[in-house]
């Protein structure tokens, strides 16, 4: 699902919400999440999952085209861990998803 598909689903689910307002809501949520992660904060959405940062130390990499060794600096990368309810939903298979789509709209 893309950001635009999420905005469309949100606007469909809540007809009183204009598409531009749905877009603003999604943008505000994603911006808040990105800012929290950039401050090193953990994000937890119960039933959905959690986002945190994993540290990657500096290392010597290789340019795949030339074979030349290059220094790759240390960095933090975002990491998502699915929550229990999300894992159960995924494990239930596509058949169950179709039932949930009918129920949730």
Swiss-Prot record:
One GO cellular component term noted in the UniProt record for this chain: cytosol
GO molecular function list: DNA binding; structural constituent of chromatin
Signal peptide from the UniProt entry: none
SMART domains: BHL
Keywords carried by this UniProt record: DNA recombination, DNA-binding, Transcription, Transcription regulation, Translation regulation
Keyword Flavoprotein: no
Entry keyword Transcription regulation: yes
InterPro entries linked: Hist_DNA-bd (IPR000119), IHF-like_DNA-bd_dom_sf (IPR010992), IHF_beta (IPR005685)
GO biological process terms on file: DNA recombination; regulation of DNA-templated transcription; regulation of translation
UniProt subunit comment: Heterodimer of an alpha and a beta chain.
Family note: Belongs to the bacterial histone-like protein family.
Role summary: This protein is one of the two subunits of integration host factor, a specific DNA-binding protein that functions in genetic recombination as well as in transcriptional and translational control.
Official protein name in the record: Integration host factor subunit beta
Organism of this sequence: Nitrosomonas europaea (strain ATCC 19718 / CIP 103999 / KCTC 2705 / NBRC 14298)
Gene that encodes the chain: ihfB
